[in-house]
Regions:
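NAD(P)-dependent Rossmann-like dehydrogenase/reductase catalytic/cofactor-binding core
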Residues: 104-164
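C-terminal substrate-binding/catalytic lobe of Rossmann-fold NAD(P)-dependent oxidoreductases
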Residues: 1-125
Length: 164
């Protein structure tokens, strides 16, 4: 949906601008979707996207105000432990000096970039995670199909369909 040269866009003036030479602020439905999936977060987060001239990798930049004090080192240790344990293959962890193209073809949901995050203090942190929004997403759809194949019954509740 992104134009390669400046042209008229009915939807959004900025999206009509040339993609190859611009970073274009845009909207995202991700925060709204998270609120639907995790009701406790509904209305507590927002977000935006930037259309940038890159092949297919995206990055998430999330700023948290923490309920209790913790150090950035403790956060890194917890993410690393999860990436090597219960979330192995889903959550990645890196301390390498990475750029977007390093994640092309990565099937994991996201890869935490330990060197890119920062802590303003022990209650306010910024975390960065990369993901392949084409290959990674396709792999998550395959995971979902495999899971659905094991489910005996599908129930509908309000707006959500869930497996039982």
């Amino acid at each position: 949906s992104q134009r390669t040269v400046d042209a008229h866009s009915k939807k959004d003036w900025r999206l009509g601008r040339a993609s190859a030479g611009n970073i274009i602020p845009s909207t995202t439905g991700a925060a709204k979707a998270v609120g639907k999936i995790i009701p406790e977060l509904n209305g507590k987060l927002t977000g935006m996207s930037f259309r940038i001239p890159t092949l297919d990798i995206s990055v998430v930049d999330v700023t948290f105000r923490l309920a209790q004090e913790t150090t950035y080192e403790e956060i890194k240790a917890a993410v690393r432990e999860a990436s090597e344990g219960e979330l192995k293959g889903i959550l990645g962890y890196t301390e390498e000096e990475v750029v977007s193209s390093d994640f092309i073809g990565d099937a994991r949901t996201c890869i935490f970039d330990a060197k890119a995050g920062i802590a303003l203090n022990n209650k306010f942190v910024k975390l960065i995670a990369w993901y392949d929004n084409e290959w990674g997403y396709s792999n998550k759809m395959l995971d979902l199909i495999a899971h659905m194949a094991t489910v005996k019954e599908i129930k509908k509740v309000k707006h959500l369909t869930y497996c039982n």
